[in-house]
Amino acid sequence: DTVPRDENGVYAVPKEQILSESRSVYGGVTELFPFLEFPDTGVKAVRCSRFMSVMGFTGVYFACVGESNVNVDSPACLLPSTIAHELAHQRGVAWEQECNFLGVLASVTSGMPDYIYSGWLLGFIHLGNALYETDPEAYWVIRGTLPAAVEADLRDNSAYWDQFRDNVVEKVSDTVYDAALKSYGDANGMKSYSMVVELLVAYYKDLI
C-alpha cells in the first residue's frame, strides 16, 4: 500500500488528482484488449454528489451525450475504480457486471498506485460479499488477515454509506433504477452489479 493516508489511516489521495488521472486509467488494459482503446474525455464531478449518495449512486453515465459523472462526496478509496467503471460505459459496454469487471481490471493494470489499490479493494468487496452470503465464518477469517490500512478503508466506506441506508429516497431510487435496467434488456436488474464475481473468478483463476 503506497497511497497517502490521513491521521486515521484512511485513503487520502486528493480527489482532484484521481479525476485528473482518469484519462490514463485504460492505458494498461488496452494493451491486453486493444478493442477497449477509446479517446477518453475524462469524467465530471457531480456538484450535487451528496444527493447522489442519498440515492445510493456512485456514478452515472449519460449515454445521450456520452458523459461519465461521478460522486465525489463518498470516500475516495473507491473513486478510481468507480471512474474506471463509468469509462467502460463510454466504450460501449452496457451491462453493469461487465463494467464492474473492467472497473477492477482497468484499475489494477493502470500503473497508478491510487487506481491499483482501488481496483483491488473493489474486487475484494465484490468477492467478499459473495463469500459472506455462503460462508460468513470464512469471510471473517479472510478479512482478519487484511492489512490495517485496508480494514480502515472498509470501515470508513461502510460508515459513510450506513447513514443513507433504508431511507425513502434510496428505496424509490433502487426500484426505479432496477426497472430501468430491466427495460434496457438486463433481466437481472440491480442484481447485475454483483454478478461481477463470476467474471473475476473466471478471469483470475488461471492467473493465480
Regions found by a protein language model. Give the residues of each.
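Auxiliary, metal-adjacent structural segments of Zn-dependent hydrolase domains
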Residues: 2-72, 76
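Solvent-exposed, acidic/flexible segments
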Residues: 15, 72-80, 92-96, 114-117, ...
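Intrinsically disordered or highly flexible coil/loop and linker segments, enriched in small
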Residues: 35, 133-137, 185-189
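Generic structural signal for hydrophobic core residues of well-folded globular domains
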Residues: 74, 87, 91, 128-131, ...
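Active-site recognition of the HExxH zinc-binding catalytic motif
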Residues: 81-100, 104-105
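Amphipathic, soluble alpha/beta structural segments
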Residues: 81-82, 86, 110, 119-126, ...
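Active-site/pore-lining binding-face segments in mid-to-C-terminal subdomains
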Residues: 101-152
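Pan-zinc metallopeptidase signature
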Residues: 150-208
